[in-house]
Amino acid sequence: MDLSLLKNLSAARILVVGDVMLDRYWYGDSGRISPEAPVPVVKVSKLEDKAGGAANVAKNIARLDGKVGLLGLIGEDEGGQILEGILEGEKINSQLVSVCDLPTISKMRVISRHQQVVRLDLEETFTEQHSQLLLNRLELVLDEYDFIVFSDYNKGSLSLIENMISLAKKAGKTVLVDPKSSDLHLYRGADYITPNLNEFKLAGGQTDSEEGLATSARKLISDAGIKAMLLTRSEQGMSLISATEKYDFAAQELEVSDVTGAGDTVIATLAVMLGAGMTPKNAVEIANLAAGIAVSKLGAATVSPEELSRKLGQYLHATGEHYQTPFDDVLQHIEFAKQNGETIVFTNGCFDILHAGHVRYLAQAKARGDRLVVGLNNDASISRLKGADRPINPLDERAMVLSALSSVDWVIPFGSADENDTPAKLIEQISPDILVKGGDYTVEQIAGAEHVLLHGGKVEVLEFLDGCSTSKVISKIKQ
């Protein structure tokens, strides 16, 4: 995965078209039953309004730093005014079209003790005449965008979606659709559709086996003239299916608080990552991580680049890929962690043959803060320090082993004869909050200590485990 593309999220120029909604939340305590009917009485203590539907897709894109526009229909009412006010506070080029004869789609949820008690929907279905207003506006703004996302909640805004997709494809745009209709032919020409499992079944998809699922998905997209399907499968994760390939992505193991808007997060993240230049497979990997974050929050939630960066770091750690992360990307991840208020700890060493002393030492170092960065001497550096017969294990293998430890967040190679094989320059680049060194050093003897102290950090010396050293391990093996 090319993590450098995460710096390029603002390159995505995305237009969201579809059913915009106002999500309203009324929070309160429910300690008694109504004397009028056998229903709970909720004493409302807090009101909250959020952008929903297609507006939530646009909000997700904006929060990921994508350049986004929004087309949708609202009524000439209070709900429309509130929704426009919410969107004004976001980095969204909002172009909502007001109609006088129908209300703004609004969903009011009563929440008590983290549970939804009831939902009230205020809506009427928009007609083709209303949809024509969006089609006309789409034609005017199409040249400003590279990706077009259609968010279909079957509320009528996209009654003319076939015409809209045709218009977008003729203009050379990449089209993504979050579908609601079971007739996938309505989305002919789309590059990606993102149905959930229930929508897939209603469209004729088979789920009895993985082979049957893939076969039926390929038939559906082939018949409908669609390039690929990203099937969201709840606890089974996601599957990206095209005519020749199928990639499966496991669901993220997080506590699910609310699945509201999870599909919005998926298609928004997919569009942003594709716009940044990622491959479809990598873009879906990131979208899967974003969905895991979103469902752990209450309500239609968004995901920030910082949250995504942290989750990506955990994911790469779990898959054993993070030791291969380019240096500039590691620095960016560290900076995100700092912005989130996390304490960065740094230590360094050769770690030629990992032993119990190393493991305990690294765990103690990690306990000093939130994230641990390990500077790892490269092979040439170790040879200069330890002799021509060292290292025993090459850099890549040492980095892989260290990266498998839960205490280690990032491994960064270093070592230059010009710098006396110390990590001083690396420490200046990272500027950790805490610098840890093992052994009987004084603070004055520790490379990089002066920089850390000068910038308000701390320096600590930890004791090594008696009887544990790489030299002793090598000696014992030779015996």
From Swiss-Prot:
Catalyzes the ADP transfer from ATP to D-glycero-beta-D-manno-heptose 1-phosphate, yielding ADP-D-glycero-beta-D-manno-heptose. GO terms for cellular component: cytosol. The active site is at D264. GO terms for molecular function: ATP binding; heptose 7-phosphate kinase activity; heptose-1-phosphate adenylyltransferase activity; phosphotransferase activity, alcohol group as acceptor. This is Bifunctional protein HldE. Pathway: Nucleotide-sugar biosynthesis; ADP-L-glycero-beta-D-manno-heptose biosynthesis; ADP-L-glycero-beta-D-manno-heptose from D-glycero-beta-D-manno-heptose 7-phosphate: step 1/4; Nucleotide-sugar biosynthesis; ADP-L-glycero-beta-D-manno-heptose biosynthesis; ADP-L-glycero-beta-D-manno-heptose from D-glycero-beta-D-manno-heptose 7-phosphate: step 3/4. Homodimer. It holds the Pfam family CTP_transf_like. Its EC number is 2.7.1.167, 2.7.7.70. It catalyses: D-glycero-beta-D-manno-heptose 7-phosphate + ATP = D-glycero-beta-D-manno-heptose 1,7-bisphosphate + ADP + H(+); D-glycero-beta-D-manno-heptose 1-phosphate + ATP + H(+) = ADP-D-glycero-beta-D-manno-heptose + diphosphate. Residues 346-479 are annotated as: Cytidylyltransferase. The keyword Repressor does not apply.
